[in-house]
Amino acid sequence: MMGGFKVQGKSLEAAQELLDSARVVAEAGAFMVVLEGIPAMLADEITKRIPIPTMGIGAGAGCDMQVLVAQDMLGMNDWVPKFVKKYADLRTTIIDAYNTYCEESSARTFPAEAYQYNAKIEGIENLK
C-alpha cells in the first residue's frame, strides 16, 4: 500500500486513499488492519468507518489496540520513531551483559560449576 519513514495521509486525497484501502482490506475478509504513521484524526475516522478492529503504531490513541516494536520501547536502539515512548533504556545494560559474558567465556570463568551439569560417569577414562 504505502510506506517509508514518513507520516502518510496528511492531505485529504491521501487520507481518502488510506480509508479506501482499509475498506478494501476489510471487504476482502481481513480480521484487522494496522494503521502506522498516520495522523491521529485520520486513524480515528478509519476506526469508526470500517467493521474490523484497527491496530495503531504511530496512529494515535483512537485505534482499537496499540502496538510498538519491543526493541524500540525498551531502548535497545540508538534511534526510535517520534511515536515511540521508551519505557526503559536497556541498550547499555544489554551491551554490558554481552561484554561481561564474552570476558568470562574467554577467561573460562563461565560457566562456573553452578552452571554446569556435574554427573559422575564411572569409567569415563575408558572411552575409545
Segments (PLM) and residue ranges:
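Alpha/beta enzyme core
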Residues: M1-P81, K85-A88, T92-L127
